[in-house]
Amino acid sequence: MELSYQEKVTLIKLRELKKASFDELVKETGLDQVAVMRAILWLQSKGLAKLHEKQKRVVKITELGEKYAKIGLPERRALKLLVEKGKVTLEDLREVLSEDELRPIIGILRKEGWATVRKEDDVLTLELTEKGKEALTKERPIDIALKVLAEKREVEAREIEELLSLKELKTRKIGEEDAKAEREVEITDEGLRIASEGLELKEEVSILTPELIKSGGWKNVEFKHFNIHAPVKRLYPGKKQPYRTFLDKIRRKLIEMGFIEMTVESLIETQFWNFDALFQPQNHPARDWTDTYQLKYPKYGFLPDETLVERVKASHEHGWITGSRGWGYKWDPRTAMLLMPRAHATALSARQLGKGVQIPGKYFAIQRVFRPDVLDRTHLIEFNQVDGFVVGETLTFKHLLGILKRFAVEIAGAKKVKFLPDYYPFTEPSVQMSAYHEELGWVEFGGAGVFREEMTKPLGIDVPVIAWGIGIDRLAMFKLGIDDIRYLFSYDLKWLREAKLVW
């Protein structure tokens, strides 16, 4: 059996001692602690030694305890002053005690029976008792415990508990309890056999230095063998939060594809941008409190410039110049002013189109949205969407399907994708995209479509616009290989450590 130099030295000592503490082995072998521990673990893995560990309760002296060991406990200093003067006031005690020490001192002196307390001319006075005189030369359990701690720095808890309760020591902040691992190493029968056969001690060299090469000394030394297949402890180096990394990669990918990221000013939108500018009628059920959140205070925001508002109003009421009949109701600007947390990132697309865009042009945003829902492994009430649109004169619905499929396959790593007809007030035709997840089955990613003219024309756009809003959290589930969407925002250290890096 191949053994390293450190293993041989440790095994030989164990043959002599049969059983030894870790500290004893360090002392006897002359090796450092790391080398001895490494040797013990290797010997144990080879069945030549056994490592026994048990937890031992210890008490360590605190910084305050060290201070009191030097200058004395507050009651001892107060007692010394009382013996000198016979009678003291609180002002007298301030000469030897801090304000923090002064507060409990009267109670301690009375409890110990060292002083009586009374008022003389409205001044609180402490007078020494006979018991107090005798106490100056007697040690209490707490005095002995402090002396032991000051001398040894660390003692077994049972040694202190024989004197007084640990609670008293900890309450006074003189000592603190801790757990300490006690290690003992024992040689096995196989270890005894190997050690008894005679082990040649030849120090090994683990590093080939320039000096060894120049001097030729490398010819006469034995180099340490490294087992590159040996099992080692798994390391968890620092890394970025997996989901955050995924979002950054998508952002970079879209920019590489020529998309421009939209500027986002706030998480709060007016209903105008969230619904009205998207040609969603004010009596639509999706605007109900069960499907969206509303701000209680402030309740109302501001509408954009009057010209744009009038166009949107006309589009809703009678279709404006689009050839549509609109929704045929009286549009209410007060409803459009209501504030709400953004319900979908498409509100950002409406804002961008209203500001003006390059034609042809491609735009995107990755933003947080909020919707009332039942939390489960595929639904959150606060989640991210990647919203985007492409504007150009020759764009068709087929271009949109191609972009969506590329998203699912290249970005999410989906193997199977399907499209189903859908309905949205602001797109026609509309489509829903789903992808197949091994654990969850078919998972809906989001919706898409061609923006209706009733939406785009009031915003000043006269060419086709294809658009989509995709639940990026669900894309991340595919890419990160998880089956519960809540893990994306989890503080679970095990998951954060073991989650794979994407791309």
Swiss-Prot record:
Disulfide bonding pattern of the chain? none
Identify the keywords attached in UniProt to this record, alphabetized: Aminoacyl-tRNA synthetase, ATP-binding, Cytoplasm, Ligase, Magnesium, Metal-binding, Nucleotide-binding, Protein biosynthesis
Question: Which GO terms of type biological process are on file?
Answer: phenylalanyl-tRNA aminoacylation
Q: Which cofactor does it need?
A: Mg(2+)
> How is its cofactor bound, per UniProt?
Binds 2 magnesium ions per tetramer.
Matches recorded under PROSITE patterns: AA_TRNA_LIGASE_II (PS50862)
Q: Which NCBIfam families match?
A: pheS (TIGR00468), PRK04172.1 (NF003210)
Q: What is this protein called?
A: Phenylalanine--tRNA ligase alpha subunit
- Give the source species: Thermococcus sibiricus (strain DSM 12597 / MM 739)
Q: Which gene encodes it?
A: pheS
